[in-house]
Each structure stands twice: as C-alpha cells, then as structure tokens.
Amino acid sequence: DYLFVIGFSLGGKYDNIVIEKMAKSAANLASGELLQFEHISNLSTTPENYYSIVDGKTAGVFASACSCAGIIAGANSDVIKSLENFGIELGRAFQLVDDLLDLTGDTSMGKPKGTDVHEGKMTLPLIHSFTILHGIEREQLADILNNFSDDRWQELTTLLVKSGSFEYVKQLIMNHIDRALNHLDLLPESNAKNLMKDIAIASQNRRL
C-alpha cells in the first residue's frame, strides 16, 4: 500500500494516461486479491483461475510499471505494448518462482518456507499436482492440503515430485522468461535494454 501511495505521488507529475494506468493497476490488484481469497483452500482451482489472480496482482503491477516507463520516455505505441507484454511475462515468471520457493526455499530468501501452503493458497505446483494425481494419491494430497502441518512436508514433497509438478513449473518459468525476452526485440539496443534482460534472467534463477 505504501509503495502505491509513493507511486501515485510520483505518477501525478506525468500525463493523465500514466495516472489512469496506475489507478487501473491498483484496482486490478484489489480484484486479484479478492479472487485469490475466493480460492483459498479450493481444490477445484484451475490454472486459468491461477493466472487470473497473478495477472491481476504480480504480473499486472509489473506490466503497468514497464508500460508507464515507456510512456514517460516518449516511446511509440508499439514499444509501449512490447514493454507491457514484457512486464506481464516477467511478472508471471516471478510469481511462479515465488511459488516454488514457498515449497523448496529457505528463510534466507525473506519468506518462511510453506507460507502459502499454510494459508491455503492454491499455487500452480499444487494445482498441477492435484490435476495429475488420481485415486489414493489424489485423496492423500487433498488431505494434506486440507489439514496441512509442518510434519507433512515429506508427504507433500513426495507427491509433487511424483506428479512432476516441480519440473512442470520450472519449464513454465523458462517459457515466460523466453517470451519476455522476445518482447524486447522491438526495442533499440541500449544499456536499459540489456539491464531488462539481466533482470529477467536473474529473476528466473532466484535460488531454484
């Protein structure tokens, strides 16, 4: 919330279109938060539901920041759209990395392991695993998610490995980063473009 207040104070110096984009981003963030709340502990959550949440929150904020930067820099509409798409793909990848870190990371990353699982958030690794598994294993996963505690980590990890969910999400991350980098092709060569490439690649490799 604080960062949005600061953002609006800075954005107020620019054209109305920048303020409108920031306002839309804030509204979508709130909508995404509400949608995520609706899907807490909801084992029927689909990948489409997941991406709707992410696009409203993380990816939407990234896209707004990137497109506003283009507008302020005086870029043409094609470049602005490319920057927006870069932000969307980068934001999706960033969130997927965050999902994996919640299941495999450590406290040194600034987020305790298992925060999302404890809160009942249906992240994509969990959604994928629940879709792939069948019979007893699917029932076991449902029981773990509905009655999660730290002593069930090994059970959960075993099922996620068996369903290939870790590798599936890692591949999706690579796909989103590749698409993000492709959206930069329209931009002229510059230090800024190289920095954006570096940021995209670095976000993909956060302690995975």
At which residue positions do the language-model features occur?
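All-alpha prenyltransferase/terpene-synthase fold signal
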Residues: 1-208
